[in-house]
């Protein structure tokens, strides 16, 4: 019987693409006096392309933008600081996120978060979505000194939740960091489908977060 569900944040609970798109349009407007010679749609599109679904850190993204568009009145530090400060104001959850977390809570299912990233930045995003009010534990890679898919970060979460691996689901969008990473310690991995990862195949897949509820009755014997 499942007693706990662990979640990734970006691309799983947080609709990162929509959030980032909203943020970069707003950032362009804030710095328009420096960017007025660049079409807004072109600048925003190039930012999203360079971002590479979050796997290129923003200092590199901004350095490339400044170089490509020959922007000399802004620094990458200014833009990065603006990103770190203001992204939280544009966080958009995936559909049914709150309903899922509420229903898990009502069923006395423990809830945890394991996310790679910088602690303050990720905690601000979790608070922006009000996720922290549902969770029993939150592990951010910077604070833990270890990141997914290392098995230790999953084992720490199990210990904090006081559940066995076979009593826990892990829901995430990254095939290796989330699904296969959690399964290497015996957790039941669930893939939150993301077209960015192409044709990854798995026996447990959800497109809508509420579909996670269908896995709560899985018995240990189904893993053998």
Spans of features found by a protein language model:
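Asp-based, Mg2+/Mn2+-dependent phosphohydrolase catalytic module
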Residues: 1-5, 102-105, 110, 114, ...
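N-terminal helical cap/lid subdomain that shapes the substrate entry/recognition surface
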Residues: 2-95
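Short, acidic loop-to-helix structural element flanking the phosphoryl-transfer center
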Residues: 60, 85-111, 151
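Residues in well-ordered alpha-helical elements
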Residues: 41, 59, 95-98, 166, ...
């Amino acid at each position: 019987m499942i007693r706990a569900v662990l979640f990734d944040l970006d691309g799983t609970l947080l609709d990162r693409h929509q959030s980032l798109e909203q943020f970069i349009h707003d950032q362009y407007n804030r710095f328009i006096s420096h960017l007025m010679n660049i079409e807004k749609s072109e600048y925003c599109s190039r930012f999203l392309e360079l971002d590479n679904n979050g796997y290129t850190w923003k200092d590199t993204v901004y350095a490339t933008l400044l170089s490509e568009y020959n922007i000399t009145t802004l620094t990458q530090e200014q833009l990065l600081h603006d990103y770190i400060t203001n992204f939280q104001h544009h966080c958009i959850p995936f559909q049914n996120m709150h309903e899922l977390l509420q229903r898990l809570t009502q069923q006395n299912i423990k809830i945890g978060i394991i996310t790679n990233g910088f602690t303050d930045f990720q905690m601000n995003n979790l608070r922006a979505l009000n996720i922290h009010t549902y969770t029993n534990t939150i592990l951010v890679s910077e604070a833990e000194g270890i990141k997914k898919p290392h098995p230790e970060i999953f084992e720490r979460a199990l210990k904090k939740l006081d559940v066995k691996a076979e009593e826990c689901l892990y829901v995430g969008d990254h095939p290796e960091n989330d699904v296969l990473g959690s399964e290497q310690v015996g957790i039941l991995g669930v893939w939150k489908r993301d077209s960015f990862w192409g044709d990854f195949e798995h026996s447990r897949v959800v497109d809508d977060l509420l579909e996670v509820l269908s896995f709560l009755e899985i018995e240990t014997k189904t893993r053998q």
